[in-house]
Amino acid sequence: MGQLYEKDMSGCGIVGFMSENGKVIPGDRVITAMASMHERGNGLGGGFAAYGIYPERADFYAFHMLLDHPKAKTETEAYLKSRCSIEMDEPIPTRRNELVSDTPILWRYFLRLKPESAQDGDEEDAIVQMVMDINAKIEGAFVASCGKNMGVFKGVGYPEDIGAYYRLDEYQAYIWTGHGRFPTNSQGWWGGAHPFSLLDWSVIHNGEISSYGINKRYLEHFGYQCTCFTDTEVLAYMFDLLIRRHRLPIEIAAKIVCAHFWDDIERMDEKQREMFRTLRTVYASALVNGPFAVVIGHANGIVGLSDRMKLRPLIAARDGDMLYIASEDSAIREICPKPAQI
């Protein structure tokens, strides 16, 4: 008799917190929060995004690179030098950890774009194109993050081990996000761990996006190349498209990605009904379907979104100037035992 296998559905753990006053928080706090959700992952991916960690080089684009071999590093550096001036480059500091293995070359570059490299004068569009080129055309090279005064630290392992490996206890940031991965549709590899990032956007995600194919094709019309074959990648690019390029408020972008049901739209007053009908029609291919909970980080804050049926957990809390979002109440209380609101 054949053996029956059931698909393990996603149980990723996510957390994000920030100081509204810009107060910096040590990295051991986000590691502690993620460690409390150890059972939500399976050791095939952990990662963090941190904002405000490079104040002495805040005006430079900080490229965090994952490089499989020396040739990838050589080709990446040649490409970067052809378009940018490199202020400084160095290995990303790490600490030996027996639970983290098969590590790529981890390198960071602090860059200024050469004036002639800007596309129609738009510096950020040029940086995005560089990321697309490196990820798609240089074998063994992957841009983990490229924003200013922020960085993504990720890899294969449990998040608390990845955090210790990257020495996150030595960093301070005014925004932290963390993710423990339980991959369901793609393999566990260093580039596939969360967060996914573009410019100062970073996305962590728990769930499954069934609209990946439609979303991917839609983004490709605007020049984005989804090379990781993972659903979370499309979310990072989608928010860049809607907010930075289409200049939509983040509240409207959220209503596009997590659109109202048509039945709900029909019950709205006339003005709202017309607006949401238009959004659903114009941005039909930007609608994200499936069970999911998402935390989006950017230089000015964090945003939590969940699917319209709330099929993945997402808890929010506040204490003073601190805001928290997490998959579980316990992750928040581990670092803020008695929040003022939850």
Task: Describe the predicted segments one by one.
Residues M1-I342:
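Conserved short alpha-helical segments that host acidic/polar catalytic motifs at enzyme active sites
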